[in-house]
Amino acid sequence: MSQLKSSAIMDARILWPAFGGAFRKLDPRTLARNPVMFVVAIVSALTSVLFLRDLITGGGDLRFTLQIIIWLWFTVLFANFAEAVAEGRGKAQADSLRKARTETQAKLLAGEDRSKFKLVPGTSLKVGDIVLVEAGDIIPSDGEVVEGVASVNEAAITGESAPVIRESGGDRSAVTGGTQVLSDWIRVRITAAAGHTFLDRMISLVEGAERQKTPNEIALNILLVGMTLIFVLATATIPSFASYSGGYISVTVLVALFVTLIPTTIGALLSAIGIAGMDRLVRFNVLAMSGRAVEAAGDVDTLLLDKTGTITLGNRQATDFRPVKGVTEQELADAAQLASLADETPEGRSIVVLAKEKYGIRARDMATLHATFVPFTAQTRMSGVDIDGSSVRKGAVDSVLAHVNQSTVASHATRPNSDTIRDLQAIADEVAKSGGTPLAVERDGRLLGVVHLKDIVKGGIRERFAELRKMGIRTVMITGDNPMTAAAIAAEAGVDDFLAQATPEDKLKLIRDEQAKGKLVAMCGDGTNDAPALAQADVGVAMNTGTVAAREAGNMVDLDSDPTKLIEIVEIGKALLMTRGSLTTFSIANDVAKYFAIIPAMFAVFYVAPGQSTGPLQALNIMHLATPQSAILSAIIFNALIIIALIPLSLRGVKYRAIGAGALLSRNLLVYGLGGIIVPFVGIKIIDMAVTALGLA
């Protein structure tokens, strides 16, 4: 994957197979998927048949007709070539992924004893099987870690050489078939049968086997078909005008007029643009499950961003212990450390380290203490330990206060007095206003104080949000922090809004509320609790390090598990829509120059006054093309060559700029609208001069 990210737009390894692919795509069943080019192929075949008739009978201008036929077929082949190049880039990526898919032997476990396993082919594994994967082993299929912790090399999938940690019981429990365990061991429950793994899906999607036309593509195809029908009718009426004028226009000339006027440029490149949009995401190490998801990213109105890891660096560290009145710092530190002994989060580990550094409190063995760890959940927003009838909890201030109130009522114990609660709230507010996160700590219903966690806003993130605002995108920060902390960080980062103390249900409600207003929403997530929101969002980006449920729910997967990529994904989506719109504008604008090339050539000999060699319609020959035949031939040659010239742009995409919609429209109309008029005038004139100089017409 990493090699492919930097490959050239027109790589020789892709171009050569694409030449053969262009001819294979002449199959009518393949051409029928592109209505415009299918019509071009039909009229090319018709003209070829008429040429053979004239060749046998000796009628017509065989030399001129043959040149028109050659360039008509080149038009079809160039369109096929553009699609074949785009598909070839996907196939090259798929070949790279296939190298990661190796036949492996799996250590199938029948019971709890790790030493008793049976070696079986990885392809024979069924969903629900439990396998042992030890250091040096290849993980045989997708699964969920049910026991153990290990360092895993996922370079075959992500292209990232740094190993990652996979462990049971958290949001880092999902493992991917084809990756390798570097150290320790894990027990894995298989979640995908052979042929249906994440790697298989990646290969299928990257190759384009599952690519379907998006709604925008279908709508544009309908427009192009409509325009084609209009030009069919317009062309069909011309022989009547010619007959009325006492002249004759050959079928070859009518076909040339028809092909140059219909939107062949965008018709030829439309499929390549769609494939290239997904390809650009893959090169960015993001896998889109459909072209619809890429398009939706370009139309996003609201962006939901997790605070931790996206807006901030995500490594919150404990910096201070702030006890309430009547409690010593050491007592607070001891309780906070005890509640964090089994907490493997960066925050939990930093509390243990800070307690040791400040007060020499050493970590204690949970097994010796006979302690039961209470893990953090999105619902309780607390964690802690229970030891011999005693409990210690740390977490969000409101959650800890609610827990203390509930536990004292249940045990008929004395509730904390109002002064202590006010003191705790004052400390928490002070921490929150400084941009920190307050963690309240209690022991057996007694409030002890607050641990100050400090995070840092990423550099340059404020400018990124300003760019999104120019695009018309509203940014919302999602955080579990209290409203004061959230407000301080939101102001520092420059987001438009925030949702504090957010639960998975809150995220889902926010997405539905935005969608009810007609907005398209994008978000990212990695946990099982994010799955409903990922499924509901128009663009749901699941982290590759996340759970199986999250990856199944999202319509994109970020192989690098970098939440900040959501911003780039939106930009890639907008670039796809801009490329399609810009080339459509360019294609339609081309017709103006082609009109001034072919119409005068067709009617130059009509309505000729006595003593004149040309008629009044010759005045439309503003390009001063040499002869009617050279004018028609030049237009048909330009029509074919412009497809080849625009292939790199269709694959690379039009660069998106973070400016207002009005300014962006004006700029694109100037570049691709006016440019679409000027370029054909210049191109057709140059080709006409070359055709005349070579004596081709």
UniProtKB/Swiss-Prot annotation:
Binding positions for ATP per the UniProt entry: D343, E347, F376, T377, A378, Q379, T380, R381, M382, S383, K394
Top-level enzyme category: translocase
Major site of localization recorded for this protein: membrane
UniProt binding sites for Mg(2+): D526, D530
Xref: Pfam families: E1-E2_ATPase, Hydrolase
UniProt-annotated location(s): Cell inner membrane
EC number: 7.2.2.6
Reaction equations catalysed: K(+)(out) + ATP + H2O = K(+)(in) + ADP + phosphate + H(+)
Cellular component per GO, a single term: plasma membrane
InterPro entries recorded: ATPase_P-typ_cyto_dom_N, ATPase_P-typ_P_site, ATPase_P-typ_TM_dom_sf, ATPase_P-typ_transduc_dom_A_sf, HAD-like_sf, HAD_sf, P-type_ATPase_bsu_IA, P_typ_ATPase
Transmembrane domains' residue ranges: 36-56, 66-86, 218-238, 253-273, 595-615, 631-651, 669-689
UniProt membrane topology term: Multi-pass membrane protein
Active-site residues annotated for this sequence: D306
Quaternary organization: The system is composed of three essential subunits: KdpA, KdpB and KdpC.
Family named by the database record: Belongs to the cation transport ATPase (P-type) (TC 3.A.3) family. Type IA subfamily.
Role of this protein: Part of the high-affinity ATP-driven potassium transport (or Kdp) system, which catalyzes the hydrolysis of ATP coupled with the electrogenic transport of potassium into the cytoplasm. This subunit is responsible for energy coupling to the transport system and for the release of the potassium ions to the cytoplasm.
Protein name (Swiss-Prot/TrEMBL): Potassium-transporting ATPase ATP-binding subunit
Source species: Mesorhizobium japonicum (strain LMG 29417 / CECT 9101 / MAFF 303099) (Mesorhizobium loti (strain MAFF 303099))
